[in-house]
A protein has these predicted regions:
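Post-transcriptional modification and biogenesis factors for structured RNAs
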Residues: 1-175
Length: 175
């Protein structure tokens, strides 16, 4: 076995990326404070051809040098928009036909491994602040909550790690 060189990875160009079909998934970042987490979400979203990222509240917007350290240019390939209020973002997405799930530990949440999706539908996931999580009002406007099963002593994962796990799972279910 031999590690591949970067030139052997057959990656598409940024121009080609803009034209290819995207996964019918929007990521909503609700008050994410860490530029590194935001950049990491951009990079993961690029890897799985996510349709768009909504940056809400205090979530910073590109371009930013600290964000670029983890995004590595994905902040220029993945479509994004800033929406001041995450509730407005959720309501707008629902009006556009998206099914919106907040990723939160909540009463009645669906475990990610039990979530069933319809490949003919469009979805959005809301990721919450690193300390407070998704705002309750945003949860109230969502179609439901999904949760990653955890078996250790901690009750949460880093938001960029959580986003990566959820995107990967939804990608497998929708692709």
């Amino acid at each position: 076995m031999r590690k591949l060189k970067i030139t052997e990875l057959n990656r598409i160009s940024a121009e080609e990326f803009k034209q290819v079909e995207k996964l019918p998934l929007v990521v909503v970042l609700d008050d994410i404070r860490s530029l590194h987490n935001i950049g990491s979400v951009f990079r993961t979203s690029d890897a799985f051809r996510i349709e768009c990222i909504y940056l809400c509240g205090i979530t910073a917007t590109p371009p930013h040098p600290e964000m670029h350290k983890t995004a590595l240019g994905a902040e220029f390939t993945v479509d994004w928009k800033y929406v001041n209020n995450a509730v407005d973002a959720v309501d707008n997405l629902k009006n556009e036909g998206y099914i919106v799930y907040s990723v939160a530990q909540a009463e009645g949440s669906i475990m990610l491994d039990e979530l069933q999706l319809d490949k003919t539908k469009k979805y959005a996931i809301v990721m919450g602040n690193e300390v407070k999580g998704v705002q309750q009002e945003v949860i109230n406007h969502s179609d439901g909550c999904i949760e990653i099963p955890q078996y250790g002593t901690k009750h949460s994962l880093n938001v960029s790690v959580t986003t990566g796990i959820v995107i990967w799972d939804l990608f497998k279910k929708l692709h």
